[in-house]
Amino acid sequence: MKGACILAWLFSSLGVWRLARPETQDPAKCQRAEHPVVSYKEIGPWLREFRAENAVDFSRLTFDPGQKELVVGARNYLFRLQLEDLSLIQAVQWECDEATKKACYSKGKSKEECQNYIRVLLVGGDRLFTCGTNAFTPVCTIRSLSNLTEIHDQISGMARCPYSPQHNSTALLTASGELYAATAMDFPGRDPAIYRSLGTLPPLRTAQYNSKWLNEPNFVSSYDIGNFTYFFFRENAVEHDCGKTVFSRAARVCKNDIGGRFLLEDTWTTFMKARLNCSRPGEVPFYYNELQSTFFLPELDLIYGIFTTNVNSIAASAVCVFNLSAISQAFNGPFKYQENSRSAWLPYPNPNPNFQCGTMDQGLYVNLTERNLQDAQKFILMHEVVQPVTTVPSFMEDNSRFSHVAVDVVQGRDTLVHIIYLATDYGTIKKVRAPLSQSSGSCLLEEIELFPERKSEPIRSLKILHSQSVLFVGLQEHVVKIPLKRCHFHQTRGACIGAQDPYCGWDAVMKKCTSLEESLSMTQWDQSVPTCPTRNLTVDGSFGPWSPWTPCTHTDGTAVGSCLCRSRSCDSPAPQCGGWQCEGPRMEITNCSRNGGWTPWTSWSPCSTTCGIGFQVRQRSCSNPTPRHGGRVCVGQNREERYCNEHLLCPPHVFWTGWGPWERCTAQCGGGIQARRRTCENGPDCAGCNVEYQPCNTNACPELKKTTPWTPWTPVNISDNGGHYEQRFRYTCKARLPDPNLLEVGRQRIEMRYCSSDGTSGCSTDGLSGDFLRAGRYSAHTVNGAWSAWTSWSQCSRDCSRGIRNRKRVCNNPEPKYGGMPCLGPSLEFQECNILPCPVDGVWSCWSSWSKCSATCGGGHYMRTRSCTNPAPAYGGDICLGLHTEEALCNTQTCPENWSEWSEWSVCDASGTQVRTRQCILLFPVGSQCSGNTTESRPCVFDSNFIPEVSVARSSSVEEKRCGEFNMFHMMAVGLSSSILGCLLTLLVYTYCQRYQQQSHDATVIHPVSPAALNSSITNHINKLDKYDSVEAIKAFNKNNLILEERNKYFNPHLTGKTYSNAYFTDLNNYDEY
């Protein structure tokens, strides 16, 4: 392109002029400390992910007892995954049926809500207890943990699983088989409860519709600790008088609680709750009131909790740590009690300090807990607040909300370090080191991004596996496995030590960053954790994306053309804090229009003729430049011609005449040569040859044969008797030759004859003695070689498993002499020997692992085995010595009683047998539990008055004979007795009628009106409870509308509440809030 493009106006219009140096940065901004961030691209090679088509909401994670599999609950699916790489072992689809979905739609719920969201996922022995919302009709199943399609039982999920997937809930399964669940018990979620079911103990729940027990709670977690079951939740604070405020709570119940008697029946008698405080200290403390998640470290009795501010306030989160002893101290302290709704909340002494779930040994309330039932009904809330271990939260962060927490205890070089993993609502995990002492603070070690840039979503679940140092994260569309030890990520000693990672240290021997377990020497392993790591804020500039192509103009001399231009900026990111500027063009120009231009003419080509008129050519092309993108093409011709040699006459034409005929062939057969010729006219200088040759008569000549005459007889040798031999020769030759004179001597023919010495018999001819080749020679003394006999076979090279032996012979019987033939064949032979395999002695394999104990109690046994296969004995080898099986006793403790009481004996059947039954009271029987029969039979036991039917049949004939013995005396006795009996009956009837008339007369007297129950059957029971509030008395007898028949695992529709129309008032005119 001629000239330069003038694009200054384009640069100014697109704003692409940038300074050569980075813009001035705020020094304070460049010096502030920020925590390291591990991007999704950096953490990607360490991650393992599992996804499944159509599966979402991976919100429930748990491990099998052997910690080899991860069990995952998602919407409409259950999965079993390998812990190593999250590969799929088994997938089970668990959807709602169409009828249930239609019923859900009819209640105004959306398609998203009317699905089966897994909300309970608990492992008990080799069984998996799982519950799902099932389109607002919760259902639970008990499955085999090794095969999720094998369903052992299916029961209602009411009171065990929430109806809505939006409701928070928690559940746990104790070792004895009881299920403790905290969830909403009805469709709209207005009846929250902490409920116990299954197992051997009676079902219990918190009081229904009583805000002092539970006030719109959001359940977070539950733990089985000692004699108690603890629940953690947040709820509207009933003791807060000024506005609506949410408090976090810790509640507990005794595991041996069986409810009250006459009061608090089917209701907890040991339920107590206390407030959890997590606040930032100051003149006016800043409270983090809403508990979001907890994590329990049983080895240290520590409970880590995540607390946040209210959703309507500024976003802020904190981590507070509570000691179990502090929680127990609050429950041992005084209660906070409100006499009535207009009274203040005041402390009240605890009637049972240091309560440890003791029970009554005797009396009417045997087996009930030591708490007084009236106290259990009134005193629920503790006065003292549970304070954290430290006055300042272990970790605080503004402008973010944490949703889940997991804690790992790591052995550093000098001390144990607690590492807290916090899940944020925007899809990252923050790794925090807890304070090392009361005076030190926490450190944010790093933040792990689980999604690519510009994408985020909340984390659904968080599970840590301490034995393998692995973190499992449940997200909306997949599950992620994150290794906690990523020491090899740091390549240098400075990066390893500067990361301040308690998992990692620099091994001076191996010269690399390793974990403590991987190090070769503790003394050579360097680590530093007291300080917090900071991120280098120096950022090198990087170009952002190119802008779209836009039209622009350019000038080329006097012509104006158009182009397409695009630009990019150094802002992704922009260089900061001394970072490098972007390298490369900030603008690209393409598709500029260009007018075509002619190239210079080429030189004239040589004349087309050397004499006479010819022409010459020259050319040019429109490629200087070539027209592009709408530019103008060149104007004019691209080729010119001119004449040449128009005055140079040509000389006479010199040329060859035509070829003459072929001459005679030089040979009649066997291949000859023939020639033809031409002459040059008008001169001697014609180009080329005047003679041309070709082969001829290439066919083979006929075969010629020629025999020489016999030579004269010549004597050969003389024998002992004076006779002698004579011989003569002749030769025969044949060949395909054109000339017979070219024949050469070929085969030799010899004849021999014997001539006697006396000449009487003349000479006799033996005929042909032999034919020899032309160069051959005949000798009567030639000796051909012959083999000697074979030697014996040599010793075998091996005693077994296939060896080799050989034998030899020599060509000396006789040796070849005077040109005789040598021996034919091998002089050495080989043969396989001892082909049978060698004997192999047996060797024991390693002992197998001990098998599972055959019984969980009462004495069982386990065993281990080994086999004689390493290798096995073979081919006569010795067998292994010793035992192939070892057994040992296990679980010798006495078994608890697992059977219910025997039922009453049944009525005798036709075969004279009675039957009684019993049932196993354990939901998950393991090993020898519930061993024995469920039925028992015995022969019927008859009393002395029972007469079998056979006896009656046999005595019928005797009775017929006795009927004839009835006489007159008998008739008189019967008549007298009947008269006396009639008189007595008449007297009784008269007396009854007189009393009835007296009562009717009394009924006509008018009495004052008093309230009476519509159903007076409970009046006596109400009178027994005069000392309690009457409303409470009605509540005690107004049974909960949800009562479980645990044996049959269904809800009894015939048990409904009773309603009374009258009101009962106490002397104090007290009312209890509902």
UniProtKB/Swiss-Prot annotation:
Q: Subcellular localization, per the record?
A: Membrane
List the SUPFAM superfamilies.
Plexin repeat, Sema domain, TSP-1 type 1 repeat
Q: Which domain of life is it from?
A: Eukaryota
Signal peptide extent: 1-22
Question: Which Pfam family, an example, fits this chain?
Answer: TSP_1
- How is this protein positioned relative to the membrane? Single-pass membrane protein
A GO cellular component annotation in the UniProt record? membrane
**Domain TSP type-1 positions:** 540-593, 595-651, 653-702, 784-839, 841-896, 897-944
Known Gene3D superfamilies for this protein?
ligand-binding face of the semaphorins, domain 2, Thrombospondin type-1 (TSP1) repeat, YVTN repeat-like/Quinoprotein amine dehydrogenase
Q: Which residues are glycosylated?
A: 147, 168, 227, 277, 323, 367, 536, 591, 717, 898, 933, 1015
Listed InterPro entries: Plexin_repeat, PSI, Sema5A_sema, Semap_dom, Semap_dom_sf, Semaphorin, TSP1_rpt, TSP1_rpt_sf
The answer to keyword Metal-binding applying to this record is no
Provide the GO biological process annotations: axon extension; axon guidance; axonal fasciculation; blood vessel endothelial cell proliferation involved in sprouting angiogenesis; branching involved in blood vessel morphogenesis; branching morphogenesis of an epithelial tube; cell chemotaxis; detection of light stimulus involved in visual perception
> The PSI domain covers which part of the protein?
486-533
Bilayer-spanning residue ranges: 969-989
Q: Mind listing the UniProt keywords for this protein, alphabetically?
A: Developmental protein, Differentiation, Disulfide bond, Glycoprotein, Membrane, Neurogenesis, Repeat, Signal, Transmembrane, Transmembrane helix
All copies of the Sema domain together span 35-484
Where are the disulfide bridges? 104-114, 131-140, 254-357, 278-320, 607-644, 611-650, 622-634, 665-696, 669-701, 680-686, 796-833, 800-838, 811-823, 853-890, 857-895, 868-880
Which PROSITE patterns does its entry note? Answer: SEMA (PS51004), TSP1 (PS50092)
Q: Which GO terms describe its molecular function?
A: axon guidance receptor activity; chemorepellent activity; chondroitin sulfate proteoglycan binding; heparan sulfate proteoglycan binding; semaphorin receptor binding; syndecan binding
According to its UniProt entry, the function of this protein is described as: Bifunctional axonal guidance cue regulated by sulfated proteoglycans; attractive effects result from interactions with heparan sulfate proteoglycans (HSPGs), while the inhibitory effects depend on interactions with chondroitin sulfate proteoglycans (CSPGs). Ligand for receptor PLXNB3. In glioma cells, SEMA5A stimulation of PLXNB3 results in the disassembly of F-actin stress fibers, disruption of focal adhesions and cellular collapse as well as inhibition of cell migration and invasion through ARHGDIA-mediated inactivation of RAC1.
Q: How does it assemble?
A: Binds PLXNB3.
Q: State the protein's name.
A: Semaphorin-5A
